[in-house]
């Protein structure tokens, strides 16, 4: 435990350096990278946050595992051994540095650091557990959606997104905007007030279609799993403001990527209508109610960024070419 406290802080410093480089590159190339590509790069880096919790192997162990995993040959054997030895040497140097510095720091300092970190982890875990209980309570109070028109619209959206699995849709009085929840058993929860507004003619089927397409794309791209990873990282890195900013940014990139995925399904003439749906329901869909759910919501700054993304969105060239070929084939 004494060694872990310093190694964890050392890894945090190294991670922050690489994170700063990643954020700088993404800002530099923001006009060249699509919203989906930026989001995928963030997901890859999100996995890196697991590294501090893995033990560092010693050189002989790394080399022996390398020989087991990669068949040896006379020509490649020396190169393989040299490469693995070099990597193991570097890892061992980092390991030795962490151990040597940690031994110079009084034990009670290490214990104090671990104690305060553990308190923060416990508090964050309690908050996450409370959110999970809220989602469970939401499901207990929800009922299967009975509105036939919206159910038909939902089935059309499933077909439009090429989703073959059956995803149950429920109605609830405790939400202001639709959300997707559940990783093993995903469900969409639809607010009753939107159903009432639809029946009264206050909102139209197009608005509901956009909302449903948005939630279904969250499901299609496994955003629930990414959400769990983000919340887990939040628990263990609660003290690191740069990583906190990074995790908040991933959530925003997730919505931008989801918007872009929806826009790829729509005609260019519908982009403005999709943006208007976000603007018209900006107050209603102020925030996603629970950290463990996916929704179309966001704060004012995030909604502004999403509107700008919609305004500047252009379908990838291969998508436009595919649509032209489809039209030509239909004409023939």
Which residues are covered by each model-predicted region?
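Active-site recognition of the HExxH zinc-binding catalytic motif
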Residues: 206-230, 255-259
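Cytosolic-facing loops and C-terminal tails of multi-pass membrane proteins
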Residues: 2-5, 31, 94-130, 268, ...
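Juxtamembrane interface helices immediately C-terminal to a transmembrane segment
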Residues: 25, 29, 33, 217, ...
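Juxtamembrane/interface helices at transmembrane-helix boundaries
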Residues: 32-34, 56, 97-202
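Hydrophobic, aromatic-rich membrane-embedded alpha-helical segments
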Residues: 49, 54, 188, 229-244
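Short helix/loop segments within enzyme catalytic domains
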Residues: 55, 145-156, 160-164, 220-221, ...
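Hydrophobic membrane-embedded segments
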Residues: 1-123, 140, 159-166, 303
């Amino acid at each position: 435990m004494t060694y872990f406290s310093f190694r964890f802080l050392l890894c945090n410093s190294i991670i922050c350096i690489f994170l700063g480089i990643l954020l700088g590159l993404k800002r530099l190339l923001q006009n060249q990278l699509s919203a989906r590509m930026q989001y995928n790069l963030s997901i890859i880096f999100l996995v890196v946050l697991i590294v501090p919790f893995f033990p560092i192997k010693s050189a002989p162990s790394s080399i022996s595992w390398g020989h087991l995993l990669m068949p040896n040959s006379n020509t490649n054997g020396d190169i393989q051994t040299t490469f693995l030895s070099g990597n193991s040497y570097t890892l061992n140097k980092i390991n030795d540095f962490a151990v040597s510095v940690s031994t110079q720091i009084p034990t009670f300092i290490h214990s104090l650091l671990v104690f305060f970190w553990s308190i923060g982890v416990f508090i964050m875990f309690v908050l996450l557990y409370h959110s999970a209980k809220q989602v469970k309570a939401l499901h207990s109070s929800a009922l299967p959606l009975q509105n036939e028109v919206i159910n038909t619209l939902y089935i059309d959206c499933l077909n439009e997104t090429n989703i073959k699995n059956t995803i149950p849709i429920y109605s609830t009085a405790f939400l202001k905007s639709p959300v997707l929840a559940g990783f093993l058993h995903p469900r969409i929860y639809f607010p009753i007030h939107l159903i009432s507004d639809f029946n009264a003619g206050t909102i139209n089927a197009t608005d509901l279609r956009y909302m449903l397409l948005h939630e279904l794309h969250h499901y299609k791209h496994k955003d629930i799993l990414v959400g769990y990873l983000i919340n887990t990282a939040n628990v263990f890195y609660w003290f690191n403001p740069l990583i906190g900013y990074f995790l908040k940014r991933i959530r925003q990139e997730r919505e931008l990527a989801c918007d872009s995925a929806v826009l790829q399904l729509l005609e260019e003439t519908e982009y403005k209508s999709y943006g208007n749906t976000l603007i018209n329901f900006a107050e209603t869909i102020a925030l996603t109610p629970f950290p463990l759910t996916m929704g179309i919501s966001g704060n004012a700054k995030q909604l502004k960024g999403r509107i700008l993304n919609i305004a500047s969105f252009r379908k990838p060239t291969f998508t436009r070419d595919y649509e032209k070929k489809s039209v030509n084939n239909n004409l023939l």
